[in-house]
Amino acid sequence: MSLPEHDVTIDATDLRCPEPLMLVRNKLMDLQAGQILKVIATDPSTTRDFRDFCRFLNHRLLHSEQSEAVYSYWIEKG
């Protein structure tokens, strides 16, 4: 599977909850509907946090993956 194209990347490595979520929330406010944000994080709680965040705020979690202790997410702004 090819990874989704993205418009902006946020590096949230070494940040702990709630910092990654706040960075994503703030950056999505700057994007237009349909634009895609890639997030790189190391906090395992982001797996749950980003899934729930997208569901509640009508964004789409297009793809997520984990490699070692690094989590990557592609979020489309709703």
Spans of features found by a protein language model:
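Generic serine detector
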Residues: 2, 45, 64-67, 72
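A broad "ordered helical/assembly scaffold" signature
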Residues: 1, 22-26, 70
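Core SAM-dependent methyltransferase catalytic element
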Residues: 72-78
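Intrinsic-disorder/low-complexity, polar/charged segments enriched in Ser/Thr/Lys/Arg/Asp/Glu/Gln
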Residues: 7, 34-38, 70-72
